[in-house]
């Protein structure tokens, strides 16, 4: 199913008030006139493949990268100072990789955090940003409340694409959780779990769809239900058990998908138990999902921490991963940064960043 939500399509995203509707109309008009942000005129498909956007510095077998993380602060994203405004925290830092030993260190630019703002919301919530990814020369981030895909530039966000839930024929925005580039297209996924009632009854399979976006902003909705079932079956999990995804990447080097589940359980989903069902495993799958293999990650962790995002370290031939692990328990949020290789060997123990819930990381 193919649909383009970039330029002037019928509005499928229903705000909860007139102001929101007017704002969305304005943004769609803006996107129609100014799609230049991704560097394409209509019909162009030439790619900008520079990654990372900031050139790494290598000296004495040590490589330094600029790295960034962005937050999903849920209900706390609403601005306390400006009306009809929602805010996310964007934090950058320097990551150093010592090639000879694979030692990873990171230094955050604490005190220089940027507050990224938007007026767009759904149901009174917005700017709950769940991913950070470079695509076609731009840094993108994804609001899991509105379904908006933003371009992040100069510490400001500009809407690019609106993703509708499930098969694309829904008035609700898609709950984006992860995104990765494959074969020149951007794949955007959700939790990969059936949407159920509190009693465990399945209401829909919308989170088991994936969006494929080309460089012109055209969206194709893909039914990944079978793929997600195969991923969780690698851990002997079947419904009503579940596996919740927020972190996935495609590797051209291995021609495989890699998933770091946020949480998993043999039992039915329970919102309270979810807080302590954090996973600590890498799952790799071939392109057709015919074979999925789990690898346990070594090192110390806690059950309340689960992966919210990860990226391969550039120039490491996709052998080294840096990831975010978040905590959401009893109104407490925290984010930890870690690094490890594909065999599960920890190269940087889980180290706390701060009390924001960062759900997107990339080399910027």
From Swiss-Prot:
Organs and tissues of expression: Salivary gland (at protein level).
Molecular function GO terms recorded: apyrase activity; ATP binding; calcium ion binding; calcium-dependent ATPase activity; GDP phosphatase activity; nucleoside diphosphate phosphatase activity; toxin activity; UDP phosphatase activity
Broad class of the protein's primary localization: secreted
Known cofactor(s): Ca(2+)
Subcellular location: Secreted
Name of the top EC class for this enzyme: hydrolase
Entry-linked Pfam families: Apyrase
Entry function: Facilitates hematophagy by inhibiting ADP-dependent platelet aggregation in the host. Cleaves adenosine triphosphate (ATP) and adenosine diphosphate (ADP) to adenosine monophosphate (AMP) and inorganic phosphate in calcium-dependent manner.
Protein name, UniProt field: Apyrase
Taxonomic lineage from the root: Eukaryota, Metazoa, Ecdysozoa, Arthropoda, Hexapoda
Gene: APY
């Amino acid at each position: 199913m193919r649909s383009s939500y970039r330029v002037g399509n019928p509005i499928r995203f229903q705000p909860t008030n007139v102001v929101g509707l007017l704002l969305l109309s304005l943004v769609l008009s803006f996107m129609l006139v100014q799609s230049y942000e991704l560097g394409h005129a209509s019909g162009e498909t030439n790619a900008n493949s520079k990654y990372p956007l900031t050139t790494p510095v290598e000296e004495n077998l040590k490589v330094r990268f600029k790295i960034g993380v962005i937050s999903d602060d849920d209900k706390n994203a609403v601005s306390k100072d400006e009306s009809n405004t929602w805010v996310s925290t964007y934090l950058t830092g320097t990551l150093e990789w010592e090639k000879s030993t694979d030692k990873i260190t990171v230094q955050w630019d604490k005190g220089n955090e940027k507050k990224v703002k938007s007026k767009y919301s759904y149901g009174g919530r917005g700017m709950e940003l769940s991913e950070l990814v470079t695509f076609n020369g731009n840094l993108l981030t994804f609001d899991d409340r509105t379904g908006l895909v933003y371009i992040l530039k100069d510490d400001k966000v500009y809407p690019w694409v609106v993703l509708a839930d499930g098969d694309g024929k829904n008035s609700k925005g898609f709950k984006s959780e992860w995104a990765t580039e494959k074969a020149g297209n951007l794949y955007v996924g959700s939790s990969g779990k059936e949407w159920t009632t509190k009693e465990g009854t399945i209401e829909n399979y919308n989170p088991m769809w994936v969006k494929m976006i080309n460089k012109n902003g055209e969206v194709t909705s893909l039914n990944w239900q079978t793929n997600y079932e195969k991923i969780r079956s690698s851990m002997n999990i079947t419904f009503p058990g579940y596996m919740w995804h927020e972190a996935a990447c495609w590797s051209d080097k291995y021609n495989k998908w890699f998933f770091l589940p946020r949480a998993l359980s043999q039992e039915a989903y329970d919102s309270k138990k979810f807080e302590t069902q954090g996973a600590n495993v890498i799952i790799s799958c071939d392109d057709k999902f015919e074979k999925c293999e789990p690898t346990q990650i070594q090192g110390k962790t806690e059950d309340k921490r689960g992966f919210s995002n990860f990226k391969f370290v550039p120039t490491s031939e996709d052998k080294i991963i840096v990831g975010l692990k978040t905590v959401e328990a009893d109104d407490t949020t925290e984010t930890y940064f870690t690094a490890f290789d594909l065999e599960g060997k920890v190269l940087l123990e889980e180290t706390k960043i701060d009390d924001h819930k960062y759900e997107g990381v990339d080399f910027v």
